[in-house]
Each structure stands twice: as structure tokens, then as C-alpha cells.
Swiss-Prot record:
It comes from the Bacteria. One of its GO terms (cellular component) is cytosol. This is Translational regulator CsrA. The lineage of its organism: Bacteria, Pseudomonadati, Thermodesulfobacteriota, Desulfovibrionia, Desulfovibrionales. InterPro entries: CsrA, CsrA_sf. The gene is csrA. PANTHER family: CARBON STORAGE REGULATOR. NCBIfam families: csrA (TIGR00202), PRK01712.1 (NF002469). It comes from Desulfovibrio desulfuricans (strain ATCC 27774 / DSM 6949 / MB).
Length: 78
């Protein structure tokens, strides 16, 4: 993990197209501003983890459904 120190008003770039600016700090919270291309999706970590888990469950369900359908199809061919 790369650790950087920035003050309010200072920025950093990720590649050429993503700029992150420290807007302010209050207590234990840091307010960040992100300038990203329109085709770039930005998620908070907890939301991203939820999306990944939901996608995993959906894929698992799809695979299970496919296996059941294949078994039923195989039984009808007998």
C-alpha cells in the first residue's frame, strides 16, 4: 500500500485522468473530491464489497439453475 500525506486543498493523480483532492477534515473524517472520466465507476468500499458479493451469489444461482436444467434435460432424453 502506498501511503501519501496531503493537506486540505492538495491533490494527487491516479494515472492521467483521475484527480483526488483533499477538501477538508473534520475529526476522524476526511472529505475527498474526485475528478474521474465519465466512464469510470466509483464505489465506496462497503458498497463495492456488497456488489461483488451479490454478483457472486447471482452467478452461483445461475450455475445451480443451469445444472438442474441440464439434469432435467438429460432425464427427458432417456
Amino acid at each position: 500500500m502506498l501511503i501519501l500525506t496531503r493537506r486540505p486543498g492538495e491533490s494527487l493523480y491516479l494515472g492521467e485522468n483521475i484527480r483526488i483532492t483533499v477538501l477538508g477534515m473534520q475529526g476522524k473524517q476526511v472529505k475527498l473530491g474526485l475528478e474521474v472520466p465519465g466512464d469510470t465507476t466509483v464505489y465506496r468500499e462497503e458498497v463495492y464489497k456488497r456488489v461483488v458479493e451479490e454478483n457472486r451469489r447471482a452467478l452461483e444461482t445461475s450455475n445451480n439453475d443451469l445444472m438442474v436444467a441440464a439434469e432435467l434435460w438429460h432425464e427427458t432424453k432417456k
